[in-house]
Amino acid sequence: NNYFNDTYQGIPIGGYNRLIEGLLEGVDTQVNTDFFADREKWEAVADKIVFTGKIDEYYDYRFVKLDYRTVRFETETIDTANYQGNAVINYTDRETPYTRVIEHKHFESFGQAVYDNPKTVISREYSTEWQDGMEPFYPINDDKNTALYQQYKQLADHETNVIFGGRLAEYKYYDMAPIIEKVLELEM
């Protein structure tokens, strides 16, 4: 029984941060930067902007704000070498208050290496309604938000120097593999 039905599953050795750092090595990038705090500057220095933030925010909520879901994590260290035997177990029943439990060591430790450390770290992920000031994670796929997104998309379709990509900019849920494939197919 598996939540994912992909033929192959995995994460890069060292994690996605290490992968992205390697991909961006030698590329002029700005991260951890509030685009909107100095928007004119960034638009002036870049021939092309890859925007992965909220599309409604990009257009200063011209129509109204889109709705999102967010998550919160509760993380704890447990005095057991192997809590659940897998990196991620998803819970879809109504009785369980969290959506998944992540046991971090299983992402890069296998076999005896799991048991070499007598403790483990787990995170429980809880889905919750998004409010201003919270980090948005997921779009809400209902008629109201889909229609509203289409209005923003019409504006985005007329942009010549901005590529809108990812969950927030395209207001679409993506798993990791499809979004990586989409990025690799991008024509800049």
Language-model features: locations:
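Active-site/ligand-binding neighborhood in enzyme catalytic cores
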Residues: 1-48, 52, 56-59
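Aromatic-acidic/polar surface patches that form glycan- and anion
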Residues: 9-16, 90-91, 172-179
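Short, loop-centered acidic/histidine patches that primarily coordinate divalent metals
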Residues: 14, 104, 126-127, 166-169
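Conserved beta-strand termini and adjacent loop/short-helix elements that scaffold enzyme active sites
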Residues: 30-34, 104, 165
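Mid-domain catalytic core of redox enzymes
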Residues: 36, 40-155
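C-terminal catalytic lobe of FAD-dependent flavoproteins
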Residues: 135-188
